[in-house]
């Protein structure tokens, strides 16, 4: 979604300058051309009054452009409010003024030109207008891109320890239109999360109403992708959040975690080491360092086909890594004695270390931490008796020390409040597998695993766990409409295109274990869909509009035979039709529904794993179609190591 820009400026004619023309001819087109959605209060303020929706934009807009050409009290009021509550995102513009007041002057200021036209008031100078617009567009873009390089507000310059209010504290309840837009978007994000549709979340994350929401959106998208094991895509989302807010602690932690999941252990340790130096009292960061060390240790000895004895031998050889993990977890527990996650991991690894080495080096420390974990868990359960993590931590402690029946009761108690959360249950399963693989209290570990596995089987029965071997996406030209000036896909070239698509699918061995995405339009989409169904490929058809509108816009103009083919494709048992407005909500203002639909397909395909994606396009290689267009899809798939196959229409006919 476009960045929001709020314009603070005089209205009408003031001091013989037509500011309405300054806005309509200079400011608005320059900012919109740079990709901003522009807001301006639509009437003069009275005694500092401003419409609540516009005041909300003033507070939360990504950029405020203040026209300081004259000393207008309304503009000074708006600029003062912004400077007081936001440190960044302001640029000043002016005409006919040789100086700026010293306390608001920054390098974020720009001069534009007006020309006298008696008896009419001065207006933007036509001779300079294009140059002025280009400079403003570039200036605005640079300001957004340099968001965290320096503070613009003189208030935050003079008070370096003053912190901006959290954006949620700047909510104006009366600004209904603004918050209805946000709440509708947030609801869609939550629905997509509950449906476990990371592709939907990625589209919605791109559509966050303003910059302050983009951090939240990127974090939610990252969390959803992490939960389905798409670590590379998840990392991109957290890096997007950090590009906006580099000091966002949660995103910093998750980046470290994901670097570890991607087995970039050295890079992960370097990242987390820097984090614990910056936040030495943050238990979560210490626990994350422990997690990186632990994962690296497990990865060094675990392997398919290895016996328990072989894994124990190799684990012992890497004892130094487990010591580092124990120290990090124990430090986190000392920093925050209520952080039982750190405590249970330190205790578990101490037991495993003792079992592997045959030496009980720190029994006193271990026992103290055991009791501390029990105390913490009891306190957590007093606050929330249905806290899954507290209950399962108690079970993870019992599996280390208690009889099998006690272990079973503890895991049953945890599963009862898991609320069918696959991620939580699978995380607990991995902890038990660690014990089983190293032959530590195997009967008790297997008893816990049996309970967790039963719960997981109820969430994901076999028929719902199908995953494709290959994921195909298609983008291609529609059949040319009658009278099209520049031919692109003439109707008489249908057989050539169909043969090229079929040959490419055969070359890629498309078959029953695969999944395909397309848009369902006449021409390339339909030919691809038919070829996929002939080969037993499951087909996801994504429509940018409700079905009647889509058929009218993208199918029916080519003739009744294409409509018949659409319904035949739809009736196939391997076809699923998804309507974008039903799944994602209405297309945002200023967004292209076709581009949005293409991104929806692309992100959903990538969420299955970039290595599985095969992008086939029937394309004339002409770019310039923007985000969601064929060129953008080609570049995005290539970025994530997916494979691209271009059927070049300039060579086919």
What does each model-found stretch correspond to?
Residues 173-195, 199, 210-227, 245-257, ...:
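Amphipathic alpha-helical repeat scaffolds of TPR domains
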Residues 326, 333, 347-351, 407-421:
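TPR/TPR-like (Sel1-like) alpha-helical repeat modules
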Residues 23-44, 51-62, 66-67, 96, ...:
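Acidic/glycine-enriched connector segments
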Residues 108-192, 575-581, 585-590, 601-605, ...:
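C-terminal interaction surface of TIR/SEFIR-family domains
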Residues 430-462:
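Terminal, low-structured helical/coil segments at or just beyond the last alpha-helical repeat
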Residues 3, 60-62, 86-90, 105-108, ...:
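Short glycine-/polar-rich loops that comprise or flank the Walker A/P-loop
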């Amino acid at each position: 979604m476009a960045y929001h820009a709020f314009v603070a400026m005089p209205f009408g004619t003031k001091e013989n300058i037509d500011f309405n023309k300054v806005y309509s001819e200079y400011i608005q087109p320059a900012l919109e051309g740079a990709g901003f959605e522009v807001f301006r209060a639509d009437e003069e303020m009275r005694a500092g009054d401003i419409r609540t929706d516009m005041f909300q934009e003033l507070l939360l807009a990504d950029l405020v452009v203040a026209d300081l050409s004259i000393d207008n009290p309304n503009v000074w009021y708006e600029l003062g409010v912004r400077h007081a509550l936001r440190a960044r995102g302001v640029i000043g513009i002016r005409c006919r003024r040789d100086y700026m007041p010293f306390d608001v002057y920054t390098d974020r200021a720009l001069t534009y030109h007006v020309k006298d036209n008696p008896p009419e008031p001065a207006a933007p100078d036509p001779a300079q207008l294009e140059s002025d617009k280009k400079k403003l567009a570039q200036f605005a873009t640079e300001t957004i891109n340099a968001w965290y390089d320096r503070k613009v507000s003189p208030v935050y310059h003079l008070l370096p320890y003053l912190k901006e209010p959290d954006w949620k504290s700047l909510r104006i309840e009366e600004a209904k239109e603004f918050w209805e837009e946000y709440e509708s978007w947030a609801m869609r994000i939550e629905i997509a999360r509950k449906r476990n549709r990371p592709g939907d979340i990625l589209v919605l994350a791109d559509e966050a109403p303003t910059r302050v929401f983009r951090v939240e959106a990127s974090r939610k998208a990252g969390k959803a992708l992490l939960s389905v094991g798409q670590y590379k895509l998840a990392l991109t989302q957290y890096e997007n959040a950090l590009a906006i807010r580099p000091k966002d602690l949660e995103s910093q932690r998750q980046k470290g975690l994901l670097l570890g999941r991607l087995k970039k252990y050295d890079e992960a340790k370097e990242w987390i080491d820097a984090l614990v130096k910056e936040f030495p009292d943050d238990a979560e960061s210490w626990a994350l360092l422990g997690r990186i060390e632990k994962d690296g240790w497990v990865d060094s000895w675990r392997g398919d086909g290895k016996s328990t004895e072989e894994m124990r031998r190799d684990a012992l050889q890497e004892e130094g890594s487990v010591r580092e993990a124990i120290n990090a977890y124990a430090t986190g527990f000392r920093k925050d004695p209520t952080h039982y996650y750190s405590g249970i991991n330190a205790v578990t690894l101490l037991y495993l270390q003792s079992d592997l080495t045959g030496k009980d080096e720190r029994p006193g420390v271990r026992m103290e931490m055991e009791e501390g974990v029990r105390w913490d868990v009891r306190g957590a359960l007093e606050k929330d008796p249905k806290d899954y993590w507290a209950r399962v931590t108690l079970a993870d402690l019992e599996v280390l020390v208690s009889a099998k029946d006690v272990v079973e009761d503890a895991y049953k108690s945890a599963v009862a409040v898991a609320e069918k959360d696959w991620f939580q249950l699978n995380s607990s399963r991995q902890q038990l597998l660690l014990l089983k693989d190293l032959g530590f209290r195997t009967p008790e570990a297997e008893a816990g695993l049996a309970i967790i596995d039963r719960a997981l089987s109820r969430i994901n029965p076999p028929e719902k766990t199908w995953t494709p071997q290959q994921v195909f996406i298609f983008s291609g030209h529609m059949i040319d409409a009658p009278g099209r000036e520049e031919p692109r896909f003439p109707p008489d070239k249908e057989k050539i295109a169909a043969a090229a698509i079929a040959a490419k699918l055969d070359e890629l061995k498309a078959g029953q274990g695969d999944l395909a995405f397309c848009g369902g339009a006449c021409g390339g989409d339909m030919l691809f869909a038919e070829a996929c169904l002939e080969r037993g490929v499951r087909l996801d058809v994504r429509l940018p509009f409700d079905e009647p509108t889509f058929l009218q816009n993208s199918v029916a103009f080519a003739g009744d035979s294409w409509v018949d083919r659409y319904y035949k494709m739809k009736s196939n048992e391997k076809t699923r039709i998804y309507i974008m407005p039903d799944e994602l909500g209405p297309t945002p203002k200023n967004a292209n529904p076709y581009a949005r639909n293409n991104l929806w397909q692309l992100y959903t395909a990538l969420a299955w794993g970039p290595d599985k994606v095969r992008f086939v396009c029937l394309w004339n290689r002409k770019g310039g179609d923007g985000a969601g267009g064929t060129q953008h899809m080609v570049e995005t798939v290539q970025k994530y190591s997916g494979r691209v196959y271009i059927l070049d229409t300039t060579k086919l006919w």
